[in-house]
Amino acid sequence: MIGKRFFQTTSKKIAFAFDIDGVLFRGKKPIAGASDALKLLNRNKIPYILLTNGGGFSERARTEFISSKLDVDVSPLQIIQSHTPYKSLVNKYSRILAVGTPSVRGVAEGYGFQDVVHQTDIVRYNRDIAPFSGLSDEQVMEYSRDIPDLTTKKFDAVLVFNDPHDWAADIQIISDAINSENGMLNTLRNEKSGKPSIPIYFSNQDLLWANPYKLNRFGQGAFRLLVRRLYLELNGEPLQDYTLGKPTKLTYDFAHHVLIDWEKRLSGKIGQSVKQKLPLLGTKPSTSPFHAVFMVGDNPASDIIGAQNYGWNSCLVKTGVYNEGDDLKECKPTLIVNDVFDAVTKTLEKYA
């Protein structure tokens, strides 16, 4: 199978989208068959992208790590992390509060945001703002910057990039921002409303994710639930927020654009050096060259439901969140397979 060649006709062209955690990797360790699966697709010039609700690093750093570990060439133009669609917001907001691990400041600046404040900058400014922060003074000084106009320039939006590590402080700081007077630090608006003072975006809503521990762990979806619950208590109305990542249509539309762009590069229709054109958030491709796209994932609630709702096929693997016998409820994967290599080979045998 590894050496077999597959030929696609113009009218029967297929493509793949792969989750990363629980499909290609478990933690930082590659899952058996992941390398062979991608090599098989590369050899046959079958287009694929990586579509993950993970994040915290630049697309280049993430694909360099994946390429190194799997011994396969993966381009930064092939990956959509949970926060990759934030690139489309660069011209919309001036100052943003970038919430997540310390690395997300660099990610946001790499996207082109001109004025990025990290939540640790606010802890540094006044530790009484976050009395239950778990960060030491040394950590705060390492992660943060001194922002001279922190109290005189308003925030335009809150963008949660990945799962933050200091939830007590981060929830407090986010709550302050979305209940402030027009995005100004140290203020509290008079009215109560479901609409936050400034827009807030969460890059995914995964309640659980799979790491090397045998039981699934809470993810950004759990963090979002806490923010939303506290907002409801303070305002008496549900928070009107924006959520990206799988299974949202916003992210699948964005991913579809990226997949079409990669197919054009792979087939020589555009050069590899041509800058990737970013779609506007919420815009569906007008046409698609694919007869079918297969989403390979381990999480029924994000990968499979997202693909199903979007009109893509799906392959559910047993190497991550999903365990055989779990109640799939409304999920209807096209295939349930052991692992990613199984997903690719069975799909190609049946559809290519």
UniProtKB/Swiss-Prot annotation:
Question: NCBIfam families from the entry?
Answer: CECR5 (TIGR01456), HAD-SF-IIA (TIGR01460)
A Pfam family it matches: Hydrolase_6
> What Enzyme Commission number(s) does the record list for this chain?
3.-.-.-
Write out the GO cellular component annotations: mitochondrion
Q: Name one GO molecular function term.
A: hydrolase activity
Which subcellular locations apply to this protein?
A: Mitochondrion
| Record protein name field | Mitochondrial hydrolase YKR070W
Q: Which GO terms describe its biological process?
A: glycerophospholipid biosynthetic process
Q: Family membership, please give it.
A: Belongs to the HAD-like hydrolase superfamily.
Which CDD domains does its entry note? HAD_like (cd07511)
Q: Which UniProt keywords apply?
A: Hydrolase, Mitochondrion
For whether the record's keyword set contains Mitochondrion, the answer is yes
UniProt keyword Transcription present:
no
Chief localisation class: mitochondrion
Supply any other comment. Present with 3870 molecules/cell in log phase SD medium.
